Amino acid sequence: VDVDDEASDDQREDENVDFTFSAKKYLADPSGRRLACRQFMAELCQKAIEQPETRMKDAAKLIKTLCDDPHSKEVAQDACASMTLLLLDILPDYRLREINADKNELEGLSDKVKKQRKEEDLLCKTYKSFLRLLTKNAKKGANSIVSGPSPSVSGKCLIQFLSKKPNSNYRGEILRAIISSSFTSSDVTIAEEASKAFSEICRGDENGDHTLEILQLMAELVKK
């Protein structure tokens, strides 16, 4: 599901978002471009934290674009880190609910509840879209040529989501990508950080569901 697939009120133009970081004036000065991107991402993230219902889409759209930046690996890494921190700040500690367009889920709800559900749906789609980029790159081999954040950076961002938001959406997909990255990455810190995250989750797992899921996925990958 694309992050831009939203209903009525959310389908406004991003007139306040500047997508000109690929302009010649920036490409001619890589360090200046990186600084400009950093400053702009920081401003967008701050606005999104203060007003997630109106600014989240702007921030997500630009940062996601920069995460796939073909001009600078450093800018892509900065964008990846910014988006990770933004989502960690905004995501709740429970599973978000997406709106099923086929099921008129908003019918009969009050305006306040409808607004809340739409905001939750947007956040869920934004999170899913970003995780898709991270999992795609994290699963690449050490010598793979990828646009955007490196497999190592992608893996570390996924570990942060798993550690700090273990009860949020898409835990299974995150676990698969982390375990795969631990086996394929030339960066040994990926395996070390993943092991630490798994240990912390298992220690706090009162009913054993998270622990069982981790063990099953590890066994599945080893068999392959």
Q: For the regions a protein language model found, what residue spans apply to each?
A:
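Charge-rich, low-complexity intrinsically disordered regions
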Residues: V1-K224
